[in-house]
Amino acid sequence: MEETSVAGDPGPDAGTSTAPNAAPEPVARRQRILFVGEAATLAHVVRPFVLARSLDPSRYEVHFACDPRFNKLLGPLPFPHHPIHTVPSEEVLLKIAQGRLFYNTRTLRKYIAADRKILNEIAPDVVVGDNRLSLSVSARLAGIPYIAIANAYWSPQARRRFPLPDVPWTRFFGVRPVSILYRLYRPLIFALYCLPLNWLRRKHGLSSLGWDLCRIFTDGDYTLYADVPELVPTYNLPANHRYLGPVLWSPDVKPPTWWHSLPTDRPIIYATLGSSGGKNLLQVVLNALADLPVTVIAATAGRNHLKNVPANAFVADYLPGEAAAARSAVVLCNGGSPTTQQALAAGVPVIGLPSNMDQHLNMEALERAGAGVLLRTERLNTEGVAAAVKQVLSGAEFRQAARRLAEAFGPDFAGFPQHIESALRLVC
C-alpha cells in the first residue's frame, strides 16, 4: 500500500532524521557590532546610537562606545556601553572657531590606542564609527571591517564648493578680503589638516589617504551618508559609498509646562543653536524676534546665557526637537544637519546661523535646494535676523521646497534598518 504525506508532513523519505541521538542544528551566531561615537559634539553620538538601536537584537549583539558626557540625554542604553576617551567638546569647538587643527597627531595616537584596546576586548565582526577618524587606522590594524558614517557634503564626489567658515580673520578684516585669500590657500589648509592621520597611517604600514580632507572624513571599508541625493547630490559614487538617509533623534525629555498652552494665533519659530552654536547668538535671535508677531520656542542645549527673555519667547534647556519642528513655521538653528533634518522631515524651512565648515556646507546645500536662508554670524544683528524671518514666513517657495525634501526623506528613513543590515552583509 502506497504511503502518502499530509500537508506539513514531509513524509518518511524527506531525509530528516528522527533518531533520538540526532545532533541539533547549530544556532546561527549573532554578529557582534561595535558602534563608536565621537563625543566632540552630540550629533556624532546620537547617529550611531540611533543606528545601534535600530538593529534586531535577535540577529546582532550590539555594543556602544563613546565618552559618557551625553549619556544622560540618551537615557537608558539597551546594549552594553563602553566608555572611550574623547577630547573635551569645548576644546574642539574652540579650536574650530580659531581655525586651528582640532585633531593633532598626539590626540589621534591616544585615540588609536583607546580604539585598539576596546576592539581587542569586544572582538566585533564589524565596527561602525561616526567622525572617529582614528578608526581609519585602528580598525584596519585589527582586521575588522569598518563602516564610516558621514554627511554627503564631505564626499569626494559631492557637487559643492567649500565655503569660508566663521574664523577670527573674517571678524577682523571682513568676509570679502578673507574669501580671496581663502580660495588661494584652502587646498594647503586642507592638506595640513590631513597630515596627522596620514602620518599615523604610514607609521602603522597603511597607505596615505592623500591630501583631500574629504577622504579623511569619509574613509571606511563602507561609507554611509546620512543625507539624501535630492539635498546633496554626488556623481560617480564608489560601490561602497551609499546614501543612508537622515538620522533623526530627539532627547526623551518631559515637555516644559508651557508646551501645551502656547498661543495658537501666531506662527511659531523654533530656535535652537545646539551644542556647537555661539553662546550669545540665541540672545540676539530672541531680541530680533521680540517685536515680531510670532511665538518663539527656544532650547538652550543646557547653555543658558540669556540675560533677557522677551514676552513672546518660551525657553527650556531641551525640547523634543522633532515635535518642536513639526509645530513650527520656521526653524532657526546653527545650520547643523541634526536640527535641519528634523525641520526638513516636517516640511519646515530653515534659517541657519552656521559658524564651522560642517554647518556652512549643510546650509549651503539647503539654500541651493531653496529650503533655507544662511546668515553669517560675524556681524549678525537683530535687523538681519528679523528680515530673514519675515522673508521665509512670507515666501511660499521656502515651504514648498522643504516639503519636497520631506517627501525625499520619507522612503530613506523608513528603510533605515534595512540600509544598515545591507551594509553589514556587504562588508562581512
UniProtKB/Swiss-Prot annotation:
Broad class of enzyme this protein falls into: transferase
GO cellular component, one term: plasma membrane
UniProt entry tagged with the keyword Repeat: no
EC number: 2.4.1.-
Disulfide bonds: none
Entries under CDD domains matching the protein: GT1_Gtf-like (cd03784)
Keyword Endoplasmic reticulum among record annotations: no
Pfam families listed in its UniProt record: EryCIII-like_C
Function: Involved in glycosylation steps downstream of mono-O-methyl-glycosyl-p-hydroxybenzoic acid derivative (p-HBAD I) and 2-O-methyl-rhamnosyl-phenolphthiocerol dimycocerosate (mycoside B) during the p-hydroxybenzoic acid derivatives (p-HBAD) and glycosylated phenolphthiocerol dimycocerosates (PGL) biosynthesis.
Name of the featured protein: PGL/p-HBAD biosynthesis glycosyltransferase Rv2958c
Organism name: Mycobacterium tuberculosis (strain ATCC 25618 / H37Rv)
